[in-house]
A protein has these predicted regions:
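A conserved beta-strand-loop-helix scaffold within acyl/acetyltransferase catalytic domains
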Residues: 50-96
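Short amphipathic alpha-helix that is part of the acyltransferase structural core
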Residues: 2-47, 165-166
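Short secondary-structure boundary/capping segments
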Residues: 9-11, 52-54, 118
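Conserved active-site alpha-helix within GNAT-family acetyltransferase domains
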Residues: 108, 119-157
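Acidic/histidine-enriched, glycine/proline-rich intrinsically disordered or flexible terminal extensions
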Residues: 158-166
Length: 166
């Protein structure tokens, strides 16, 4: 079987079994909004339900759930989102683990899965942005921007509007 098609095996933790799901088309945007707000994730606090819907339409949402025995549902305890142009670049977003589940390897499994997910395609590089989790990512081969081959630039939409470009 193709390695890319394999969903990570469930993992046993002191809290119970954590199972992994590709919920790109099944997770409710409201559930994501509640999860990210409950975990006090600063970069998602402003997202509306409609924005979550649009984000899910153009990327893959990989989740970790604390599942009761013999169940497919369960409490959302981890998530990451991956976007790809399917040829050159993919980007990791929203890597989050529930605070009471940190240190169990959930984020590691989610990131590894995102990096090998078949939906991403045959890209040449992965990128991500982080303010406070930079020490987590070198284990996967990520390096700080100044070690890359290009300058990372961005512009906010309000600046484009100010300049009459949008």
């Amino acid at each position: 079987m193709d390695r890319d098609l394999l969903v990570p095996e469930p993992m046993s933790t002191t809290h119970g079994t954590v199972a992994f799901f590709d919920e790109s088309w099944t997770v409710e945007p409201k559930e994501l909004q509640i999860f990210f707000q409950a975990e006090d994730v600063y970069w998602t606090s402003h997202r509306t339900i409609e924005q979550w819907r649009r984000l899910l339409a153009c990327s893959r949402m990989l989740t970790a759930r604390l599942v009761p025995e013999g169940s497919k549902g369960g409490r959302l305890v981890g998530a990451t989102r991956v976007w790809s142009d399917h040829a050159y670049e993919a980007k990791l977003y929203d890597v989050v683990t529930a605070q009471d589940m940190m240190g169990l390897g959930i984020a590691t499994v989610l990131v590894q899965w995102a990096l090998r997910h078949p939906w991403v395609g045959d890209v040449q590089r992965f990128v991500l942005e982080t303010r406070d989790a930079a020490p987590f990512y070198p284990r996967f081969g990520f390096a700080r921007g100044e070690e890359m081959d290009s300058v990372h630039m961005r512009v906010r939409v309000d600046e484009l509007k100010r300049r009459g470009l949008r």
